[in-house]
From Swiss-Prot:
Gene giving rise to this polypeptide: mauE
Role played: May be specifically involved in the processing, transport, and/or maturation of the MADH beta-subunit.
GO CC annotation: plasma membrane
Membrane disposition: Multi-pass membrane protein
Keyword Transmembrane helix belongs to the record: yes
Record key words, sorted: Cell membrane, Membrane, Transmembrane, Transmembrane helix
An individual GO BP term: methylamine metabolic process
Name of this chain's protein: Methylamine utilization protein MauE
Pathway named in the protein's UniProt entry: One-carbon metabolism; methylamine degradation
Subcellular location: Cell membrane
One Pfam entry name: MauE
Ranges annotated as spanning the membrane: 4-24, 53-73, 75-95, 127-147, 153-173
Length: 186
């Protein structure tokens, strides 16, 4: 394993980043439960009743994963759960890309902007899966973080999340602009 993956500051940065990612996803889904149910149903990988259950339960599971990632005794199982969820999300995205259903919304964040499914989103989820697995495998070998390392990791993880959300918003704006041009026949 790469030595940097067992550095306390790196692990804290990854844990905070993924925790913030999962809490942001959970909160946006909880605020827009019916809309998220429509997104899950529109993926057409589950029966209608299962889509309803997933739309109700998934945000709670995502919030629990977020909490687990920052509570050290729970961080390894939470990271494994995060990796499993991200892999399932990647599979659902890939199924729809393979079906040619790239016009549907990924449902990642309910920020008012639609983000169409694509191979890029599949890749993004696979990279996030790798980060979660890096936490799960690196944490047991890591030494405890000092206060400075923990604080630096916290700031680095929060900064990474802000950059990630900004890129996500820009991607949504770009997709909206492309859809608008297509609708106008340009």
């Amino acid at each position: 394993m790469a030595d940097f993956l067992i550095q306390p500051m790196v692990l804290w940065a990854l844990r905070i980043f993924l925790a913030l990612l999962f809490v942001a996803a959970a909160l946006s889904k909880l605020r827009h439960v019916e809309e998220f149910y429509g997104v899950v149903r529109n993926f057409r990988v589950l029966p209608d009743l299962a889509s309803r259950v997933v739309a109700l339960v998934l945000p709670v599971v995502e919030a629990a994963v977020a909490v687990g990632l920052v509570v050290t005794p729970l961080a390894v199982p939470a990271a494994v759960a995060a990796a499993a969820l991200l892999l399932v999300f990647a599979a659902a995205l890939a199924i729809n890309v393979l079906r040619g259903r790239t016009q549907i919304d990924c449902g990642c964040f309910r920020n008012g902007l639609k983000q169409p499914v694509s191979w890029l989103l599949v890749l993004r989820n696979l990279v996030l899966t790798a980060l979660a697995l890096a936490i799960a495998t690196g944490l047991p070998a890591a030494v405890p973080a000092s206060l400075t390392e923990g604080a630096t990791g916290l700031l680095a993880g929060a900064t990474a999340m802000l950059i990630y959300l900004s890129a996500s918003l820009l991607g949504g704006l770009s997709a909206a602009q492309t859809a608008n041009k297509t609708a106008k026949g340009r």
